[in-house]
Amino acid sequence: MTLSLANRRASLPVAYRLYLPNAWAEDDDRRAKAGVPEAITFKTKPQIALEQIRWACEVGLPGSMALVDAGYGHDSKLRAGITELGKRYVAGIQPQMLVWKPGKRPGRTPKKGQRDAPDTTSVKDLALGLRARAWRTIQWREGSNEWLSSRFARLRVHVASSHERACEPIQEWLLIEWPEGEKEPTKYWLSTLPSSITFRDLVDAAKLRWRIERDYQELKQEVGLGHYEGRGWRGFHHHATMCIAAYGFLVSERETIPPSGPRAAARLPQLAVPDSYRPRGSSIAT
C-alpha cells in the first residue's frame, strides 16, 4: 500500500505499508514470527489508503487532488473521506457502479435489498447510451513521450449508493474512455474537480496516474524493491524505506537533466587528469 506525491514533472512514494489480510491479523503465531506490532490490526485497503491521505494532510504535505485507481475508487467511504479532508479526487471506478440517470435526483432511500431501478443505471449502460456527439478525441502526454489520444465523454452525475444517500448528494464528473476499435468503453472515473474544468484538463488529471505506475516499475527494476526475501514486518518496511530513499535520489538527479529538467544542467569544469594517474588494473599502475 503506497501513497505518492505527484505533479506533471515527477512523483515519489511518501508512505508505504504492507497490507495484512484478516487471516494474518487474527493469527497470533504468524504475527509473532513476522514481528507484526500489536498496534497493527486488520483494516481494508481503502481504510489504509484514507489513513495515509489523512496523515499527509496532517503533516502538511502538498497536494490538492487525490488520484485513486479502480481498485479503490468504488469505495464510497474513501471518496467521502477524501472530500471531508478538503481534497478533490479523480477516482477510477468499475463499469457496474450505479449513478442516477441524467435529470434524476436522489430520492428516498430504498428498503434493504431494493433498488430504484427505473431511476438508476450503471455507468457502462449510461456510456453505451450516449450519442455520438458526446464523444471527443482528446490528446495527452505521459512525460516526454509522444502525444497519445483516445475518445472520451464526460457528464455530471450523482452516485447512487446507500452512503451517498445518507449524505448531502453531490454532483460530480463522470469521465469515460472508449478508444476507437474497442467494442465498449474501457475506463471510467468519478471526479470532484470543479464543474468549470476544461475537458482536456480533466483527462490530463485522470491520466496522471501513469507516473505512479512508473514508480512501481522503477522501484522494482532500478532499486530492488522486489528483491526482499525476508518474512519480517520490520525488515520489509526497512527495505522499502531504503528503496524509496534511493529512488528519491534518482528522481532528484533526473530533474537536473533535460528533458525532465527545466533547463540545461550546469556544466561542471573538466578537471585535468594527473600525469601520474594510471587506471585501476593497468599493467603499469603503481
Residue spans for each PLM region:
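Short, solvent-exposed helix-loop connector elements
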Residues: 77, 137, 191, 199-206, ...
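Domain-level cores of phosphate- or acyl-group-handling catalytic modules
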Residues: 30-105
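An anionic, glycine-rich sequence signature occurring as long contiguous blocks
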Residues: 6-42, 90-94, 99-211, 279-281
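Metal-dependent nuclease catalytic cores in nucleic-acid-processing enzymes
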Residues: 1-7, 248-250
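Generic structural signal for hydrophobic core residues of well-folded globular domains
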Residues: 193, 206-209, 219, 248-253
